[in-house]
Amino acid sequence: MIQNLAKIKKAAAISNREAQRLPEEKAAAIIYACDEIIAGKLKDQFIVDGIQGGAGTSANMNVNEVIANRAIEILGGTKGDYTIVHPNDHVNMAQSTNDVIPSAGKLTVLDLLPDLLHALESLHAALLDKSQEFDHILKMGRTQLEDAVPMRLGQSFHAYATMIERDIRRIERARKELFTLNLGGTAIGTTINASDYYLHHIVPTLAAVTGYPLMQADDLFDATENLDGFVTISNTLKTCAVNLSKMCNDLRLLSSGPRTGFGEINLP
């Protein structure tokens, strides 16, 4: 999250410099400080609790102050001399907690999803392999734990693979909603204190910094007051978790025994 806040501050400094609102020397120092944070430096300077009131204002200002003080050092000044680089006037220029924090949150979720998707894809492939390996094994199919009709064990594992594939597709669809940001809307979506140049360049600049295909929301008021994209991805993750839990419970039941349980499979 902190690194993504730094990426936003870097993109903002670039855009404000190009808009000729931020002097080149200050912008260069801010960008350099942001790059240090993105690289994992200065971690001990971020002391604000992750759980906080005020919609993230304290986290936003913590980042602004760290970047400002580091930029001051880079320019040869003394930390705390905000006449050189100011946390709010320069680092936070044309921004608000209300567009910075949700955008950083979306970037952070986007950063975390690839590991999950890779794990799910590996699981999907393994289940498909098992469905082929077990395709010749007959077993009893059941409804409400009562014997129903015969089926192949491979069919059960193919069903699990199909379920996981559906989870993958669902997460990928939800992921796309996170590419839309309200950056440039500032406090409530009015774009107050943001130049026209900044408004039209901040998101493309951030896209270049992050490598994500980001786009600015068509309605900045809606994107500022409604964060249903987070709800969508949360719902898909919960659905995936429920599916995984159900599959694990099935396998646990089928491996029960060995004397008085089902004992149809052996879990390694």
What feature does the model see in each segment?
Residues 1-268:
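Conserved, well-structured ligand/cofactor-binding cores
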